[in-house]
Amino acid sequence: CEKLLAEQFNLPTFTVLLEGALEKGKDATAGGAKVNVGPTMNMCGFGTMVDSVAAIKKVVFEDRAATLEEVCAACMQNFVGYEDLRTKLQAAPKYGNDDDFADAIAADLWKWFSTCTMRLKMYRGHYCDAAVQMVQSNVGYGAMTGATPNGRLAGMPLSDTMSATQQADTHGPTAAARAWAKAKASRISDLAVPRATIRWDKLIISYGTSRLGVE
């Protein structure tokens, strides 16, 4: 992948803006940057995965309200005939609410994914970086993904980036931010805030540090 990228998909305009690239005589795709990282191994649907594992742990292993086989069968049938089980799975703790039950699972899963990814040696000698797919990828991948143990129906979008599952973060932005911090995901999450909750006359935007805040 890296070799083909350097040979066939050069980025000359981008390269001339990089410090040290012209001196090296290398395109950005061929290691011309002062600091070279990547490529990345991208994950999609982190929140969906966390909530699914949390639901299985809670419903199957702690409450013993269903077997793992029953959960698998429910997902295979898109929860048709398993509506009561789906309700139980949906009631399990959700990532993004400062809930230690779900957030501990999130931290473990991200550590596992990033550790496994960084073991991969890449073409230019760097390790592979763990990353997440950004906006819109979750919709396309969700359309191709069957039902999941968190109660999500087949074909519905997966969760976006490393943020919580859509409408699952019900305790506000502070709780969501605390969950990201526990998962070490604060720099690669996004957050939707209702317009009615923002004091626009007090809004502070800092583009340089990618921060948005309120006085």
What feature does the model see in each segment?
Residues 1-215:
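Acidic, glycine-enriched catalytic cores built around paired aspartates
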